[in-house]
Amino acid sequence: MADGLDFTGMLRSAGLRITRPRLAVLNAVKEHPHAETDHVIRAVRVQLPDVSHQTVYDXLNALTAAGLVRRIQPTGSVARYETRVNDNHHHVVCRSCGAIADVDCAVGDAPCLTAADDNGFDIDEAEVIYWASALTARDLRVLDDSPVAHQMKGKAMPPNT
């Protein structure tokens, strides 16, 4: 459990079986927001050294489908994962280092942007990615999980295994 989140209760509420790999994946994504899959695998292996890549991929897919984890994939980037879900927030991505930070919705509730024409769709979410050039990750208080941001913040990544 991290930051008061009841991962066991979350899995139960979503109708998912409670397994050690799923709990470890949820914990890894919570502790390393915006982490790439390889980083999630390394973090999970700190708790479960023998877990396979496929098990982590399966857990990420199940948790994303259940709405417990959000998958984001900025253009030109690999998929990233976070546990901050259901609040319609957006992201800012640094063009130079790839760091990602959360940006709260500009106005109102989901969707916080209104399309000029809904073309017959019932729009319930707007996803915005802001692109920027960071002076430094520290200046932007970036909470990214990229190796570059970790190096800039002096935070060690789990070893690459």
From Swiss-Prot:
Against Pfam families, the record matches this protein to:
FUR
Instruction: List UniProt keywords, sorted A-Z.
Output: Cytoplasm, DNA-binding, Iron, Metal-binding, Repressor, Transcription, Transcription regulation, Zinc
Location within or outside the cell: Cytoplasm
Query: Which residues of the sequence carry a binding annotation for Zn(2+)?
Result: 94, 97
For this UniProt entry, the molecular function terms from Gene Ontology, in alphabetical order, are:
DNA-binding transcription factor activity; transcription cis-regulatory region binding; zinc ion binding
Q: What is its main location?
A: cytoplasm
Provide the GO biological process annotations: negative regulation of DNA-templated transcription; regulation of secondary metabolite biosynthetic process
Record InterPro entries? FUR (IPR002481), Fur_C (IPR043135), WH-like_DNA-bd_sf (IPR036388), WH_DNA-bd_sf (IPR036390)
Annotated Gene Ontology cellular components are: cytoplasm
Q: Which cysteines are joined by disulfide bonds?
A: none
What does the UniProt record say this protein does? Acts as a global negative controlling element, employing Fe(2+) as a cofactor to bind the operator of the repressed genes.
Family of this protein: Belongs to the Fur family.
Q: What is this protein called?
A: Ferric uptake regulation protein 1
What species is this protein from? Mycolicibacterium fortuitum (Mycobacterium fortuitum)
Q: Could you read off the lineage of the organism from its UniProt record?
A: Bacteria, Bacillati, Actinomycetota, Actinomycetes, Mycobacteriales
In the UniProt record, what gene is named as encoding this protein?
A: fur1
